[in-house]
Amino acid sequence: MKLISWNVNGIRACVQKGFLDFFHEADADIFCIQETKMQEGQLNLELEGYYQYWNYAVKKGYSGTAVFTKKEPLSVSYGIGIEEHDQEGRVITCEFEEFYFVTVYTPISQNGLARLDYRMKWEDDFRTYLKKLEETKPVIVTGDMNVAHKEIDLKNPKTNRKNAGFTDEERQKFTELLDAGFIDTFRYFYPEQTGIYSWWSYRFSARAKNAGWRIDYFCVSESLKDRLDDAKILTDIMGSDHCPVELDLK
């Protein structure tokens, strides 16, 4: 089973940069995207053989998520059931027979960490939401989580210690997610791998220099460990400031 997640940084722009070619070539069982930056009706994607589910932000041209799946879910829900968190189209949950599949676009803490306090509340509420799901069946959670967990997860850790995405507070919340019983699948397979990133700033020729961050993840419940086959970061796929990430299950 092949699962793919990609922050497309605007699906309408990404479609102009080869999104559909990659989508069809990948032939994933479940393909999810974050930061769609669109409202309902602004784009009609013809994806034969896939069910489509979209969650739009109230604010136009901002945030948003979508899931495309070959198999129809048993149920689909949008958001996490907390109004203050559910205005930005950040979460879609698809229930399948064997697991819940959750895609997330985690709120960024912003320049000057203006939104860090909100981010901390989000992290706790989202983790609680995942653990509640897990009481019923295992969970796969994937998307742009807007944090580089360890120093090996970004090119320049020392100069970014107090920047959004690499603060001690954000990193601690990711640790708490793992401590709550989730596996960072890429690190499960490649615990010491350096120089592999999923996001590069558009500034300073960052991608050409591979001055990146690994902030896109597939995390799974511990009970799914035996089904893990491989985790990949598809660094050669262009079209966004992020690249897709992949999880293969047995």
Q: What is the role of each PLM region?
A:
Residues 1-47, 57, 62, 177:
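N-terminal, active-site-proximal structural segment of metallo-dependent hydrolase catalytic domains
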Residues 1-9, 98-110, 142:
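Active-site-proximal beta-strand elements of phosphoester/diester hydrolases
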Residues 7, 23-41, 101, 130-151, ...:
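Active-site beta-strand/loop signature of hydrolases that rely on acidic residues for catalysis
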Residues 37, 42-109:
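Structured beta-strand-rich core segments of catalytic domains in phosphoester-bond hydrolases
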Residues 51, 125-211, 215:
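Metal-dependent phosphoesterases centered on the DNase I-like endonuclease/exonuclease/phosphatase
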Residues 60-75, 196, 204-226:
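Conserved beta strand-loop-helix elements of the APE1-like EEP
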Residues 81-82, 107-123, 158-162:
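Surface-exposed cleft-lining segments at the edges of enzyme active sites
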Residues 232-250:
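Surface polyanion/phosphate-binding segment centered on an Asp-His-Pro turn
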